């Protein structure tokens, strides 16, 4: 075992002395050492319950003959970090989480790992670490929050963001805004729609790195505790059989994840995270592949913000395995792949029926015959950009309008809130990319302001930043190359006509080649906004959105 280096032989007496100091018995030291990565903290609603999950995992590991040892991982609440400088620090934590987990696992020679994440960057960061370390690993998340209720209708985090826009537009009272504030987030857990956290927890299940139910069992259900115990027991089987992350997260598994991403209508952030996780597994996952998969994958689920169902309804309808079973009627999944259950995908999903055909549409009656996410290209985004097609109003799938250009989120939000953006406009927010931000902030506040003011069917927003999974509307992000490196988005001027055709996967602005070259010759790179600390290091190493904003090691 890996832990033999710190537990066996006379040479390991100093290490055993320190393990004794932990209160471990001789018998515990001789068992496999299972690291449990706890992301518990008291600032993230989706992580406040993880101590309960961790204790259940520890019980499961002990029941199956292992020695559980807990160590921490950080986690940011994107909702709390939203709309201020804190959002620059969200995406960057994905790599901090991967790096620090690698360091802890290697330094202490764990035999296996159980990852306990829940929210946005925490899940992909730990998946990246798992792929990088390639020691037996299983995931069990904290689970989704239950939806709230206002006026008898279910609501979630996206509802409060749009309520702010409605209040600023004079459409609701301050009292109604306060009601939304007090009711949209009624329990612990990851926010209740198909936002980024739940998207990634569901896709972890699809990849084969978590047991069935991981993405959908609500945080407050006792089944979540049972799932954690089963995960703790299962890791011992994975260790015995030496089933490792790269055995599970194969190229075919990532294609399954992209397919299910389209079927579920996941967050556009998945288009950043899946390539980054694949990269750590030694697999190149080109985002262009998404359109090929989308073209043959029907969108079966419209969970919030795209629709009025929530993850709790998806759980009751049969969960991710039921959606996989439905999609597999079209033979779109590789089902012979091994998973963390010790069984194949086919064995996992066998008999998992669709219990609610309103929540999970049959393949014969999908929301659309193509997937929930689209990759667009054109002279505005030569390398690519991304949009959550399933959350775009039908009338905005094709749009043409004048550019309203802003060089930061704050200026754009002020213009929207003061009525300077009108029907037909295309809001451009640039210098918010991975390097330019730095940190690629989410533009939830501007998109929510657009929706809240009733402009969701007439105004588009384009950015080299990214979006919260709670965003809906014609919100097009991850424009690559970004403005900070001289991408064409930096050359757009106020009033330029922008042409968006989501069904044709195109995005352009009207300009002659001569004028484009003239603007390019006049463009000058901007000085970095931040020159010290982690963000400065991050900006110097990060790649573009179309590559998953991975960090590139400098060549010496």
Curated annotation (Swiss-Prot):
[2Fe-2S] cluster binds at residues 119, 191. This is Dihydroxy-acid dehydratase. GO terms for molecular function: 2 iron, 2 sulfur cluster binding; dihydroxy-acid dehydratase activity; magnesium ion binding. It comes from Clostridium kluyveri (strain ATCC 8527 / DSM 555 / NBRC 12016 / NCIMB 10680 / K1). One of its GO terms (biological process) is L-valine biosynthetic process. Mg(2+) binds at residues 78, 120-121, 442. Binds 1 [2Fe-2S] cluster per subunit. This cluster acts as a Lewis acid cofactor. The keyword Membrane does not apply.
